[in-house]
Amino acid sequence: MKALLDYSKIEKYIIYNDMTKGSFCKNAGISYSTLKNVENEKGIAVASAQKIAAALHTNLLSIIKEKKHE
């Protein structure tokens, strides 16, 4: 199963917290290529989506826009 995320919310978080994309990836425990897949609106693994949501806020699972089965 794959998830699509709203990259604009992630980008706002990165900018607001004066982070780099690399430091965000390190804090979230994801690879930079995973973040690029989010930015390019490619599906990512749900586990990675959950890591990103947890890095933003523990209750912010609403950034998952859509789930698609593959």
List the predicted regions and their residue ranges.
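A short, Lys/Arg-rich alpha-helix, primarily the initiator
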Residues: M1-G22
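The alpha-helix within a helix-turn-helix
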Residues: I14, C25, A53
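Residues in the helix-turn-helix
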Residues: S23, T34, S62
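Recognition helix of helix-turn-helix/homeodomain-like DNA-binding domains
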Residues: G29-I44
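Short, basic-rich loop-to-helix N-cap that marks the start of a DNA-contacting helix
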Residues: E41-A54
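Short C-terminal boundary/hinge segments that cap the last helix of small helical domains
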Residues: H57-E70
